[in-house]
Amino acid sequence: MSIALSSLIEATKEDEGLLRQILSSFSCNKDEDIESFLHSRAVEFESLSKARTYLICDENQLMETNFCLDQIVIYGYISIALKILSVPYDVSNRKRKEIDGLSAKIHGEQIKDFSCYLIGQLSKNSSVQNNDISGAELLQAAYDVIMAAVDAVGGRYVMIECHEKEKLMQFYAVNGFEEISHIADGKCPMVQMIRKIANA
């Protein structure tokens, strides 16, 4: 099950040390930025409504401990936000129309910017022994949150931004994402990938 960080903040408002303890139990040995975000920035992003973060936990384990906060085990986490996808000029009008749903142009000009749901963070907890939660399960948790938003306000595409690494890009490709653009980021180039939301 997923626990909204906003709910955890509310539950620990009398004990900020407990909140820090829970969040600091997460580690990611593959990407320090993912770990740092949860430890240092997720709460601020939550308060500013820049992103919503969800902790993935074991519902049975929570019930066994009577939802005791200091015994929460984080198996993974996801963060979701809204973001504008700026499509490169070399992307075809056919693709632009597919993304927009109606047209490739507005007032005779190519549509360049599209609103998307961004899965900004997605990772399992390296510090949990025998943590068998899969990337596909984390993606499904993200989709569940996004679909609730889609039902309320609409939306056509989900976007991710990941390091330009073959294994990582292949994971997202297998799960329905396609490359749309690249981001120059010094020594760590990034790629943007998108996936159409079902029934959009």
List each model region and its residues.
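Non-catalytic substrate-recognition and accessory regions of acyl/acetyltransferase enzymes
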Residues: 1-130, 137-159, 167-200
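His/Cys-centered metal/cofactor-coordination and adjacent catalytic loops
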Residues: 162
